[in-house]
A protein has these predicted regions:
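An acidic/histidine-cluster motif and surrounding catalytic segment
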Residues: 1-88, 92-221
């Protein structure tokens, strides 16, 4: 089963935050995960060309950097050879049984998925009344709900992207006009998901928490 379960984790990493990288390296070792840190496009190194798609009066440089790194991850996912591709931001803390729970829960993931959100960012959850015993993967609508935030995303701290999802995202991004990104990453991604009518799922219970929300880290944005 382990041999067939090929997954790579792409980490959206701001390089000055070395303690975050070290913490995650230990986590990946503990859970036997293949990983790749996305370290290009730090906020200090962004070119005018990189920034063309942003309205920089509305999106600060650290968020521009964050979004560009997510886009870079989509490009890698589109072309990689792994069955599953996971994007993590560098402030995440993995569940103690992360690998086993992920392997087990992914057996329920429908093949039509574009994204699967697995973390509890912003403390967004499928309401208990909508959950079913032994069901770990839930379809998530793309519109705003009282319980589900601004749309399909929880935050962009931990989510899987399928090859077809990554391909749609990369194609969409190549058509963006100058100054068209005017929102933080999770709000922008909600808009893209609606524009592309992507198929979105949430995992319950979640298996990733954000270190900036627990107080382990200060926010880097």
């Amino acid at each position: 089963d382990h041999a067939r379960f090929t997954l790579i984790a792409y980490v959206i990493h701001y390089t000055p935050l070395k303690e975050r990288k070290q913490f995650l390296l230990n986590e990946f070792y503990k859970h036997s995960l293949i990983y790749h840190f996305i370290e290009d496009y730090d906020r200090e190194n962004l070119s005018d060309e990189n920034l063309k798609i942003f309205n920089i009066n509305k999106v600060n440089l650290s968020m521009c950097s964050n979004i560009i790194k997510h886009i870079h991850a989509y490009k890698k996912i589109k072309n990689n050879d792994y069955k599953y591709s996971l994007i993590l931001e560098d402030d995440v803390i993995l569940d103690q049984e992360f690998g086993d729970k992920l392997r087990k829960n992914l057996k329920q993931l429908p093949n039509d998925y574009d994204m699967l959100f697995i973390g509890n960012g912003s403390n967004l959850h499928i309401p208990l009344g909508r959950r079913t015993p032994f069901k770990f993967i839930y379809k998530k609508g793309r519109e705003r709900t009282k319980w589900g935030g601004n749309g399909a995303t929880r935050t962009t701290d931990s989510y899987l992207v399928s090859k077809k999802g990554a391909t749609k995202l990369v194609n969409y991004i190549t058509t963006l006009k100058e100054g068209s990104i005017q929102l933080p990453s999770d709000w922008w991604l909600n808009q893209v998901i609606r524009d592309l009518t992507l198929e979105i799922y949430w995992m319950e219970p979640t298996i990733v928490i954000q270190g900036t929300e627990t107080g382990k880290y200060e926010s880097s944005h």
